[in-house]
Amino acid sequence: MRLILLGAPGAGKGTQAQFICERFDIPQISTGDMLRAAVKEGSELGLKVKEIMNSGGLVSDDIIIALVKERIAQPDCANGFLFDGFPRTIPQADAMKEANVKLDHVLEVAVDDEEIVTRLAGRRVHPGSGRVYHVDYNPPKEEGKDDVTGEALIQRDDDREATVRNRLSVYHEQTEPLVQYYREWAQQDPQTAPAYHRVEGTGSVEAIRQQVLTALEG
């Protein structure tokens, strides 16, 4: 089971990724984890990555693809893998195709922008414990206060509406074209292209999970 998980920030990919990885016994691979691991190992590629990151530069697609090929050759990828947040752009997807990285499925978790804004901008956190509330879906007993300690809840900078909308616009600009890319490839070349599935990311976690299973297992 070799798959890519696509979806906007706040679409609930993390919850589904965890379920898929447990179900099929595959690792979840993100570029951030790969880059950190390469730096830690101090391999030739890792030293290159460290140098680029220390100078504040962007790691090139060539290096990322080389890291991907190294990573998926590891023993824990024997049953497959799940790419989360990679590829991010069409050039990265093209580079994966050219590098002959085989994929079985591309799964898009689709959620309307306004629903995502409501989900994320409504989150409130208790800094001391990490307890998470939501002003609509899971409100504290007393507005703005943690149920256990009575201390003030905060809204993380990442969850502010302007920040959420900015992240969504970056997603639509850079990553959403991948949805079209994989959908068209699956239509044009069903023999070699990964199967493309779109799952509605609204409703209960269980209902979404069922859609995911139906898509991946048929």
Curated annotation (Swiss-Prot):
EC number assigned by the record: 2.7.4.3
On the tree of life, the source organism's domain of life is Bacteria
Q: Where is this region: LID?
A: 122-159
The protein's matches in Pfam families, at most eight in alphabetical order, are given as:
ADK, ADK_lid
* PROSITE patterns reported for this sequence: ADENYLATE_KINASE (PS00113)
UniProt cross-references to InterPro entries, sorted A to Z: Adenyl_kin_sub, Adenylat/UMP-CMP_kin, Adenylat_kinase_CS, Adenylate_kinase_lid-dom, P-loop_NTPase
Q: Where is this region: NMP?
A: 30-59
GO BP: AMP salvage
Sites binding ATP sit at 10-15, 123, 132-133, 203
GO cellular component annotations, sorted alphabetically?
Answer: cytoplasm
Quaternary structure per UniProt? Monomer.
The similarity annotation says: Belongs to the adenylate kinase family.
Q: What does this protein do?
A: Catalyzes the reversible transfer of the terminal phosphate group between ATP and AMP. Plays an important role in cellular energy homeostasis and in adenine nucleotide metabolism.
Record note on domains? Consists of three domains, a large central CORE domain and two small peripheral domains, NMPbind and LID, which undergo movements during catalysis. The LID domain closes over the site of phosphoryl transfer upon ATP binding. Assembling and dissambling the active center during each catalytic cycle provides an effective means to prevent ATP hydrolysis.
What's the protein name?
A: Adenylate kinase
Origin organism of this chain? Chromohalobacter salexigens (strain ATCC BAA-138 / DSM 3043 / CIP 106854 / NCIMB 13768 / 1H11)
Organism placement in taxonomy: Bacteria, Pseudomonadati, Pseudomonadota, Gammaproteobacteria, Oceanospirillales
- Supply the gene name: adk
